[in-house]
């Protein structure tokens, strides 16, 4: 009996931009052959707000409150990079205590970022219960931020050129250590629930595999890069702030799939806890903000800015602080990867050019490549493993 020939035509399906699994206003134009993905085109720009142009029309002090709106899960990281750029361009020293406080805030933000990724990612693949456990711990981080900065999730407005806005309140370090004591066993609890769960592992192992060479060629960074066997972390490579004072390890895996990216982020939370514990014990005294370094002497009235025996004299950032002539690119390691700022000054209070490099924009570019050949049901798991926030992608 002769069989009838069947002819199939590709079907184009729109995912988003209004769908909770899109993690923001992301639209995916997916071409399907049955249940197989044969092409994918991400459509971005729905949340573009001109953050770079705003920076070029504001002083640095005026711009810091804006930046946490780009990535609500990484507000401290963007505050840090926005003040690091003019600091390095103007060679402004940062007091040691201020640098330690910055590290504490950045590592707390790294844990909060990974928790905010982990809860929705598990919900995307069908595990709803850990979502509520994870948000319980995030609230404790927000309590610490509220005590130190006055705000919880965004608009902390804590970083300043030359330091931070204010010192830590009395008892804050003890509360931070209490959080570390509480959160360490909770990570073990997550791993018991999730890491070796056979359903979870079968669901995401082997999905969205990125080889080492592909990760490098696509300019990936953060957990996306380290999960593919590249041990690259800007905290070690660039040695910014005071990370060289601490003993910690770079978290990396070799498989390059969704499961490896999950393992990297869980291990990073452990390493961040270790850094926070060390910083709380080793934090020195002294001022928390500086624009001048002077040596005071009763015999010699001369001031020596970079002398050996000097003390920092705290001074608020003047609204007329002029960004010197020159250009510079500075970067740091956020929870999603490398974020950077290219700044070009022309001796004015506002920068002539302010270019922002968002980690999740670069990481998102590989999505069409790793989706080809996947099943339609795996799109959400692969997209979720990348960790994108559309506010920083579109800017």
UniProtKB/Swiss-Prot annotation:
SUPFAM superfamilies: HydB/Nqo4-like
Gene3D superfamilies: Cytochrome-c3 Hydrogenase, chain B
Membrane topology per record: Peripheral membrane protein
Gene Ontology terms, MF aspect: NAD binding; oxidoreductase activity, acting on NAD(P)H, quinone or similar compound as acceptor; quinone binding
PROSITE patterns, alphabetized: COMPLEX1_49K (PS00535)
GO biological process, one term: photosynthesis, light reaction
UniProt keyword Metal-binding, yes or no: no
EC numbers for this chain: 7.1.1.-
Catalytic activity: a plastoquinone + NADH + (n+1) H(+)(in) = a plastoquinol + NAD(+) + n H(+)(out); a plastoquinone + NADPH + (n+1) H(+)(in) = a plastoquinol + NADP(+) + n H(+)(out)
Keywords recorded for this protein, A-Z: Membrane, NAD, NADP, Plastoquinone, Quinone, Thylakoid, Translocase, Transport
Transmembrane segments: none
GO cellular component terms, semicolon-separated: plasma membrane-derived thylakoid membrane
Compartments reported by the entry: Cellular thylakoid membrane
InterPro entries: NADH_Q_OxRdtase_suD, NADH_UbQ_OxRdtase_49kDa_CS, NDH1_su_D/H, NiFe-Hase_large
Function: NDH-1 shuttles electrons from an unknown electron donor, via FMN and iron-sulfur (Fe-S) centers, to quinones in the respiratory and/or the photosynthetic chain. The immediate electron acceptor for the enzyme in this species is believed to be plastoquinone. Couples the redox reaction to proton translocation, and thus conserves the redox energy in a proton gradient. Cyanobacterial NDH-1 also plays a role in inorganic carbon-concentration.
Family indicated by similarity: Belongs to the complex I 49 kDa subunit family.
Subunit (UniProt): NDH-1 can be composed of about 15 different subunits; different subcomplexes with different compositions have been identified which probably have different functions.
Name the record gives this protein: NAD(P)H-quinone oxidoreductase subunit H
């Amino acid at each position: 009996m002769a069989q009838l020939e069947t002819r199939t035509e590709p079907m184009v399906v729109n995912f988003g931009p209004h769908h909770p699994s899109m993690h923001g206003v992301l639209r995916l134009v997916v071409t399907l052959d049955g249940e197989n993905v044969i092409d994918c085109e991400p459509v971005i720009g729905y949340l573009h707000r001109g953050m770079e142009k705003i920076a070029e029309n504001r002083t640095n002090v005026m711009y810091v409150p804006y930046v946490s709106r780009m990535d609500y899960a990484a507000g401290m990281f963007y505050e840090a990079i926005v003040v690091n750029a003019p600091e390095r361009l103007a060679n402004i020293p940062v007091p040691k205590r201020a640098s330690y406080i910055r590290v504490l805030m950045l590592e707390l933000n790294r844990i909060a970022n990974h928790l905010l990724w982990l809860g929705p990612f598990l919900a995307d693949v069908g595990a709803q219960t850990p979502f509520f456990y994870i948000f319980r711990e995030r609230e404790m981080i927000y309590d610490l931020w509220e005590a130190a900065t006055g705000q919880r999730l965004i608009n902390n407005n804590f970083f300043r050129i030359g330091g931070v806005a204010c010192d830590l309140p009395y008892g804050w370090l003890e509360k931070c250590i209490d959080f570390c004591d509480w959160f360490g066993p909770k990570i073990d609890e997550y791993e018991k629930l999730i890491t070796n769960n056979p359903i979870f592992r079968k669901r995401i192992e082997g999905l969205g595999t990125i080889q080492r060479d592909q990760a490098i060629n696509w300019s990936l960074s953060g957990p996306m890069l380290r999960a593919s066997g590249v041990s690259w972390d800007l905290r070690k490579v660039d040695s910014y702030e005071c990370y060289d004072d601490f003993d910690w390890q770079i978290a990396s895996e070799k498989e390059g799939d969704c499961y490896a990216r999950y393992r990297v982020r869980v291990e990073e939370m452990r390493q961040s806890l270790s850094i926070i514990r060390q910083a709380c014990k080793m934090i020195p005294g002294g001022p928390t903000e500086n624009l001048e370094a002077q040596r005071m002497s009763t015999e010699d009235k001369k001031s020596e800015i970079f002398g050996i025996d000097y003390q920092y004299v705290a001074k608020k950032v003047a609204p007329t602080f002029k960004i010197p002539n020159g250009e510079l690119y500075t970067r740091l390691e956020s929870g999603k990867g490398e974020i950077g700022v290219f700044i070009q000054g022309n001796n004015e209070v506002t920068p002539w050019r302010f270019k922002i490099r968002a980690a999740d924009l670069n990481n998102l570019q590989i999505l069409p490549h790793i989706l080809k050949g996947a099943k339609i049901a795996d799109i959400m798991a692969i997209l979720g493993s990348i960790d994108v926030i559309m506010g920083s992608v579109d800017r």
